[in-house]
């Protein structure tokens, strides 16, 4: 269980800014952010999207992060965040968890500590985006649901351990 007197602050590397239809991905070999594709639908990312460096998720990639921002940042931006919740999902490759975070230095969001403090409609928008954004590609995503702070912290801890184990 996380000690709420000390927030867990982590860094996230942003790949895709809020409001973008462009899908960017970090190329591990070239160490650059590359344009992957334009989303096939007219949907846009509901929040900044990136990953936690030096982690390894169950899908073999770094652990995904969703960062609530008032204004979009940019690909390659690093933001200090604290985790709030876990979005549990499955795609064609299997489990695809994402950690919902808020920027540590943004007074519009940094008061949020738990899933229950996130605007409920925003949570619905995020779920709706991930349930439908790949439909026109003929791919489908199953959103299992939201889990709280403890699940997010546990997933982050496991992803860090998995990364360290793989890179001994």
Curated annotation (Swiss-Prot):
Residues that, per the record, bind substrate: 23, 37, 49, 133
E.C. designation(s): 3.6.1.1
Residues involved in Mg(2+) 1 binding: 59, 64, 96
InterPro entries per UniProt: Pyrophosphatase (IPR008162), Pyrophosphatase_sf (IPR036649)
Chemical reaction(s) catalysed: diphosphate + H2O = 2 phosphate + H(+)
Compartments (UniProt record): Cytoplasm
Quaternary organization: Homohexamer.
Family that this chain belongs to: Belongs to the PPase family.
Name of the protein: Inorganic pyrophosphatase
Source organism: Methanosarcina acetivorans (strain ATCC 35395 / DSM 2834 / JCM 12185 / C2A)
Origin organism lineage: Archaea, Methanobacteriati, Methanobacteriota, Stenosarchaea group, Methanomicrobia
